[in-house]
Curated annotation (Swiss-Prot):
InterPro entries the record matches: T-conotoxin
Top-level taxon of the source organism: Eukaryota
Organism: Conus pennaceus
Any GO molecular function: toxin activity
Domain commentary: The cysteine framework is V (CC-CC).
S-S bonds: none
Name under which the protein is recorded: Conotoxin Pn-B01122
Length: 64
């Protein structure tokens, strides 16, 4: 039971500590959102190509 107050105090100290990034941010860092947007855009283009090319080959020429 003696350890419980010490444990609670340690938890409070850890929770109130300022969060620090593991490495400093540089100008070359790109937000994760842009990677997700690029992935969604690429998947959308590929799915449009598959659907369109299945029915009409001439459509594939415009989706490049």
């Amino acid at each position: 039971m003696r350890c419980l107050p010490v444990f609670v105090i340690l938890l409070l100290l850890i929770a109130s500590a300022p969060s620090v990034d593991a490495r400093p941010k540089t100008k070359d860092d790109i937000p994760l959102v842009s990677f997700q947007d690029n992935a969604k855009r690429a998947l959308q283009i590929l799915s449009n190509k598959r659907y369109c090319c299945y029915f009409d080959y001439s459509c594939c020429l415009y989706l490049r």
